[in-house]
Every structure is written in structure tokens, then in C-alpha cells.
Amino acid sequence: FREYSEYDLKVRLPNKKIRVIKKIKIPLLGLHNIKNSTAATALALTVGLSISNIKKGLRNFKGVQRRFNKIFTFNNVDFFDDYAHHPTEIKEVLNGVKKVYSNYEKICIFQPHRISRLKDLKAEFASAFKDADKVILFPIYTAGEKIKLGFSYSDFAKEIIKKSKVKLFLVNDKYQLAKYIKYNIYGKKIVIGMGAGSISSWMREMPKFF
């Protein structure tokens, strides 16, 4: 497998000229990263950078923190961290992972961020995990919100199972997560932690529990 995206780009510049760049490579996965790099490429062409320098710069770009960053390996399984906390972001990350790791079981560890966001986008979240095989669901990171959710969290979990057609496990804290990983994560799998709350720091703590 490869942990990069490759694509061709056709750009119409402000002077109406058409430029075509073949086989652009970026060491990042996901449609959202391709969209960002195409915008950067168009700008670079507009200000006069050469195609070779543009391709070199994109090829060597390391990305930003918490955008599909590999954080550790356990039982020969790679664990990644991503800031995705909106249904659209989740879909794009999982779609990119599916294309590259097509023969792997894809496990998403998700921590919803803010009660209000989950209330407003409940249906969108429930169907956002279709490109995963399994979801491990954390309690909501409230970010200080004190409003009521308005529905059962277990019912929300069932809705994810129904709409995204995945297996799902509820965990209450990082200790339950560590136990689950230790005894269940091995073989041909890939694991992505997603969320804008404490999930990132918890994921990075996992190796000390094994």
C-alpha cells in the first residue's frame, strides 16, 4: 500500500492559459488534502513557480498536525490521529483511507465534540462512518457545554450501526479503550482516532498501557 495521493491537474490561469500537471504526489490521504493542494498549486502557477518546483514542494510537504498523523504501531497495526470532528471531514478521511487500505479492516475511534454539534447533526454523524468497518465510540467531549443532549446516547450508537452499517463498541474512558486495543487490535487492520477533544492526547497515551 502507499500513504500518499496521486492525481493529475488541469488549471485555467488568470491569463486564460491552460496548464496541465501530471502525476502530482502528496504524502497525505483524503480528498480534502487533494483539494487544498490543488488550490496551492493554482496559486503557485499564477505567481510563476515552475512545475518541477511545485511538484517537489508538494511531494515533500509533511502536512499539519492532527491530519492523519501516524502516532504509533502496536501488534503490527498502525494507529493514526486526525482532527476530523464534523461529518463531512469524517467521510473524507475515511474515503481516503478506504482507497489506500482497501484490504484492511478500518477501525475508527470517535469522540464527538460538543453536545450542540451532535444534536444539530445527529443524522449526518450517524451516516458518516460508511467507509469504516468498526467504530469505537467515546462519550461526548462537552467543551464546557451544559445543555441536554435530548436523546439516548445508546440510541445514537444504534443509529450509527443502522445508517453506516458498521460494528460498534461503546467505551467509557481511555482505560477501557486501552484494554480493548490490547486484546482485540491485531492483524490486517488500521486504526484512526478522530475528534477535537481529548481523544488525541488519549490516543498518544495508549502505548504505556500495553
PLM regions and their residue ranges:
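C-terminal helical cap/extension that packs against the catalytic core
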Residues: 126-187
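Acidic-glycine-rich active-site phosphate/pyrophosphate-binding loop
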Residues: 1-22
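A glycine-rich beta-strand to alpha-helix segment
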Residues: 176-207
